[in-house]
A protein has these predicted regions:
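N-terminal glycine-rich cofactor-binding segment that shapes the pocket for flavin-like pterin cofactors
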Residues: 1-102
Length: 102
């Protein structure tokens, strides 16, 4: 069960539109000058760090460096299984990814 709803159901289903923030942030930045943008939590444990660095770096350039990146480990075993990754190594992978991003 999903722990963040009263009945244990997921709040969003697979049909709920969800835009990629790294596409939307440069679009919003193009029409603003003072707003800063934050990704909330990017599940870094299931992402490729070089691609994250390139994507976030591009958004930072296009926004005039008005971007902040929040990262997390991800707690859902299904995500790791679907990507054929070992959930038990997520902490070490995130540590390494943060080193790459810096």
């Amino acid at each position: 069960p999903y722990p963040y709803s009263v009945g244990g159901e997921r709040i969003w289903d697979e049909e709920t539109p969800c835009m990629d923030p790294w596409v939307v942030i440069p679009a919003m930045a193009a029409v603003t000058t003072r707003i800063r943008f934050f990704s909330n939590v990017l599940k870094l444990a299931i992402r490729e760090p070089i691609l994250v660095a390139k994507t976030v770096g591009s958004a930072a350039v296009l926004s005039g460096d008005r971007v902040a990146l929040g990262v997390g480990l991800s707690w859902m075993p299904e995500e790791f299984r679907s990507l054929h990754q070992d959930m038990r190594t997520r902490g070490a992978r995130v540590d390494e990814a943060i080193a790459v991003l810096r």
